[in-house]
UniProtKB/Swiss-Prot annotation:
Protein purpose: Transcription activator involved in the regulation of genes expressed in response to environmental changes. When overexpressed it activates transcription of the multidrug resistance ABC transporter PDR5, thus conferring resistance to the fungicide fluconazole (FCZ) and cycloheximide. When overexpressed, it also confers, independent of PDR5, increased resistance to 4-nitroquinoline-N-oxide (4-NQO). Preferentially binds 5'-TTACTAA-3'.
Protein's name in the database: AP-1-like transcription factor YAP3
Region feature Leucine-zipper, mapped onto this chain: 172-207
Species this chain originates from: Saccharomyces cerevisiae (strain ATCC 204508 / S288c) (Baker's yeast)
UniProt keyword terms in alphabetical order: Activator, Cytoplasm, DNA-binding, Nucleus, Phosphoprotein, Transcription, Transcription regulation
Length: 330
């Protein structure tokens, strides 16, 4: 039957796809829910020798019946189909445009094709696969949950790793800053010690120089040494104590008072005699004129006393001789 033989009452067409023709395997599904005139205009190439129109009146639309026994889609009307070997798929475009059904068939007409047709039909009628097989949906959600759980675990592990890394970096930075501060303090201390060492060395050099100068001055002072003259009391105590030792302490307190008298007199022999205080005064006058060892003179005078009524006394001639001797010895 050709497209020119189509009746005016024809409101639909049926397409038989030859499995050997691979060019017409693709079917534009947007035209299934449009009117017949638009569908024919948009798909003129579909009307070929393999397309067989059939009359569908307004009140005589072929009824679709789903047999529950084998889930096969049947058309209830006397409509001739091509042979089973040439039939692969049937596309029905009704006037109502509510839905379209694909009936998959092959040469063996096995149960797998029936199951796929039933699944597609139930999908178009609003029957969700999850209502028929909830276990399948549950199994589909399990991988998603495991993936989400793994992602969460990975994020937590990465966060913990970043936190540990930041803590370690902060610890190392603190140690670096502390070591730098210690290094600066050590450098400062070394510089202070270097300055102190320089000052000590300079001071040592100055002390050595001053020590040499003082040593030379001491030598000069020794050459220019001037004997210290004892005081009157020191001279008297020394001479009287020595006289007491020589005379075994036979002098009394009254004799001590007599010995302290500063007197000069002439003895029986006509010698000029000086008591202890007078001797000290005479030696003191001589020390102003010349430098001599007074200690030497005092040591030589001891034991040379002349005992008279005025206490121990020393001849002036003896004193002069000892002074000359002390001057020569110097």
């Amino acid at each position: 039957m050709t497209p020119s033989n189509m009746d005016d009452n024809t409101s639909g067409f049926m397409k038989f796809i030859n499995p050997q023709c691979q060019e017409e395997d693709c079917c534009i599904r947007n035209s299934l829910f449009q009117e017949d005139s638009k569908c024919i205009k948009q798909q003129p190439d579909l009307l070929s020798e393999q397309t067989a129109p059939f009359p569908i009146l307004e009140d005589q639309c072929p009824a679709l019946n789903l047999d529950r026994s084998n889930n096969d889609l049947l058309l209830q009307n006397n409509i001739s189909f091509p042979k089973g070997s040439d039939l692969q798929a049937i596309q029905l475009t009704p006037i109502s445009g509510d839905y379209s059904t694909y009936v998959m068939a092959d040469n063996n007409n096995n149960d797998n094709d029936s199951y796929s047709n039933t699944n597609y039909f139930s999908k178009n009628n609003g029957i969700s696969p999850s209502s028929r097989s909830p276990s399948v949906a549950h199994n589909e959600n399990v991988p998603d949950d495991s993936k989400a759980k793994k992602k969460a675990q990975n994020r937590a592990a990465q966060k913990a790793f970043r936190e540990r890394k930041e803590a370690r970096m902060k610890e190392l930075q603190d140690k670096l800053l502390e070591s730098e501060r210690n290094r600066q303090s050590l450098l400062k201390e070394i510089e202070e010690l270097r300055k102190a060492n320089t000052e000590i060395n300079a001071e040592n050099r100055l002390l050595l120089r001053s020590g040499n100068e003082n040593f030379s001055k001491d030598i000069e002072d020794d050459t220019n040494y001037k004997y210290s003259f004892p005081t009157k009391d020191e001279f008297f105590t020394s001479m009287v104590l020595e006289s007491k030792l020589n005379h075994k302490g036979k002098y009394s307190l009254k004799d001590n008072e007599i010995m302290k008298r500063n007197t000069q007199y002439t003895d029986e022999a006509g010698r000029h005699v000086l008591t202890v205080p007078a001797t000290w005064e005479y030696l003191y006058k001589l020390s102003e004129e010349r430098d001599f060892d007074v200690t030497y003179v005092m040591s030589k005078l001891q034991g040379q006393e002349c005992c008279h009524t005025h206490g121990p006394a020393y001849p002036r001639s003896l004193i002069d001789f000892l002074v000359e001797e002390a001057t020569l010895n110097e």
